[in-house]
Amino acid sequence: MAKIYYNDDADLSIIQNRSVAIIGYGSQGHAHALNLRDSGVDVRIGLNEGSKSRAKAEAEGLQVMSIAEAAKEADVIMILTPDQVQAQVYEESIKDNLEEGDAIFFAHGFNIRFGYIEAPQGVDVAMVAPKGPGHTVRREFEAGRGVPDLVAVEVDASGNALQLALSYAKGIGGTRAGVIETTFTEETESDLFGEQAVLCGGMSHLVQYGFEVLTEAGYQPEIAYFEVLHELKLIVDLMVEGGIAKQRWSISDTAEYGDYVSGPRVIDPSVKERMQDVLKDIQEGVFADRFMKDQASGAKEFKELRAKEEKHPIETTGRKLRSLFAWEQTDADYTEGTAAR
């Protein structure tokens, strides 16, 4: 059984007696910074010169400086820049500003697990990873609740790294919901697998194929969109509330029977075998190497794949429908998925 920590297991004064630098001010960065500030923690933001996020951070009353300055001032540095730039940011602006007794934190273990970042001796390396997007982390904190976090320690140079990480998690509201102890390896590999095989890659392509099957059979695109994409949220919400069992209990007998007899025809044992291949590529560093090499060469493959997927007919249909119905988001930037970029 996983070890789970709550409010009574964490001492907020530990992080309150440290100086924290949040490197990056995107989806997670703004939530961490604001929650820590509201928890009485000394926080500053480290950003690249000319960053578009500077004005947003300053508007919240946060102290903003260069990444190097923030790393030099602070003794806890949370790196929340995108995975593909973390190693460069670390080498250019953070590494030489670390001192014995400092700690570097991450919200995802990618760069530590695959060896792109190696901390000097005497520096704690830990992870505090909220299991939710930044706007949810902030909203739940303001409501007096929290989002579950993962916590891990890779290097415990001080002998107090876990307590420091738990204190940080308490500062952003994680211990209100529960903080699960893990390792950098477990978090990184399982997170990448979940994204690629189920949550993002698996789900996206399942939805696209479902849309194609219906429209190619002559059904209206708008009807197909509702049946294979829009209603997906209703099903996922039920799963989150009570597992697959509650989802099956909540739907009609017709739908439940169809789940049992037709689901295995689509997702058969061969899919599981291919999922195991995906996991193997992650574990052996094949995916990480491919991703980082592509990013280093200008992200050519990444951009080509993104452009191709954006042209799928379900996107055109979805944009049209979302603009017509009052129950949808009015913030077009958020609706189209660019708010955190």
UniProtKB/Swiss-Prot annotation:
Necessary cofactors: Mg(2+)
Q: Where does Mg(2+) 1 bind?
A: D191, E195
- The segment(s) forming the KARI C-terminal knotted domain are 183-328
Instruction: Give me the comment on cofactor binding.
Output: Binds 2 magnesium ions per subunit.
Active site residues of this protein: H108
Q: Listed GO molecular functions?
A: ketol-acid reductoisomerase activity; magnesium ion binding; NADP binding
Q: What is its EC number?
A: 1.1.1.86
Q: Which Pfam families match?
A: KARI_C (PF01450), KARI_N (PF07991)
Q: Where does substrate bind?
A: S252
Name the enzyme group at the top EC level: oxidoreductase
GO CC annotation, single: cytosol
- Superkingdom, taxonomy of origin: Bacteria
Q: What's this protein's function?
A: Involved in the biosynthesis of branched-chain amino acids (BCAA). Catalyzes an alkyl-migration followed by a ketol-acid reduction of (S)-2-acetolactate (S2AL) to yield (R)-2,3-dihydroxy-isovalerate. In the isomerase reaction, S2AL is rearranged via a Mg-dependent methyl migration to produce 3-hydroxy-3-methyl-2-ketobutyrate (HMKB). In the reductase reaction, this 2-ketoacid undergoes a metal-dependent reduction by NADPH to yield (R)-2,3-dihydroxy-isovalerate.
Cited NCBIfam families: ilvC (TIGR00465), PRK05479.1 (NF004017), PRK13403.1 (NF009940)
Family the entry assigns? Belongs to the ketol-acid reductoisomerase family.
- What is the protein name given in its UniProt record? Ketol-acid reductoisomerase (NADP(+))
Q: Which organism is it from?
A: Kocuria rhizophila (strain ATCC 9341 / DSM 348 / NBRC 103217 / DC2201)
